[in-house]
C-alpha cells in the first residue's frame, strides 16, 4: 500500500509528483490519465494500489496483485515531438538509478539492465515495465503518459508468464 506521507518526505523533484492522485484501484493508471476531462498539469502523478487491467507494449497484460506492486503514470506535456521515442528509455534509466540510489549490497545489483525498449531486469528477472502513450488532438500533441509497473512484493505469477 502506498503511503503518501512517506512519498512526500522522499520527493525530490521540481514538478513530477507535485500534483498527484492516489487511487485505491483503477483499470489502468494510463487509461485514467488519458480519459478526458482531466485537469492534469505537467508532471501530474497518478498512483494506484491496484490495477485491474494493467498492460504493456503491444497490448500485453501486466500481472500484479493488489498492494504487492507499484503502479503509476506520469503525465507530461513535451515541448517537442522529435524525442518522444526516448521517453521509455529515459524512464527505464531512471528506475535503475532509483534502485541504485539505495546502495543495496545485493550481488544482483550489478545485473540491473534495460531490455530495449521498455523493461528493466535484474539478471533474467523482469522487475519493471514501462508503457508510454501519446495523446493527440487535431493532429497536435496534447501530452504524453508514462506508465510504470514495478514488481515489488509479487511472489507468484501465472504459468504462461
Per-region residue spans from a language model:
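N-terminal lobe of the biotin/lipoate ligase/transferase fold
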Residues: 1-107, 111, 135
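A structural signal for short, well-ordered beta-strand segments
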Residues: 72-74, 118, 130-132, 146-150
Amino acid at each position: 500500500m502506498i503511503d503518501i506521507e512517506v512519498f512526500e518526505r522522499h520527493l525530490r523533484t521540481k514538478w513530477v509528483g507535485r500534483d498527484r492522485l492516489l487511487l485505491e484501484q483503477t483499470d489502468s493508471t494510463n487509461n485514467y490519465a488519458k480519459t478526458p476531462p482531466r485537469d492534469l498539469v505537467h508532471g501530474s502523478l497518478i498512483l494506484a494500489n491496484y490495477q485491474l487491467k494493467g498492460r504493456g507494449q503491444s497490448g500485453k497484460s501486466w500481472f500484479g496483485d493488489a498492494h504487492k506492486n507499484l503502479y503509476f503514470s506520469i503525465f507530461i506535456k513535451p515541448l517537442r515531438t522529435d524525442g518522444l521515442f526516448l521517453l521509455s528509455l529515459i524512464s527505464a534509466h531512471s528506475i535503475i538509478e532509483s534502485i541504485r540510489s539505495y546502495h543495496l549490497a545485493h550481488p544482483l545489483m550489478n545485473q540491473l539492465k534495460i531490455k530495449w525498449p521498455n523493461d528493466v531486469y535484474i539478471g533474467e528477472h523482469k522487475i519493471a515495465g514501462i508503457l508510454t502513450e501519446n495523446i493527440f488532438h487535431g493532429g497536435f500533441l496534447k501530452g504524453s503518459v508514462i506508465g510504470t509497473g514495478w514488481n515489488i512484493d509479487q511472489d507468484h505469477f501465472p504459468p504462461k508468464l
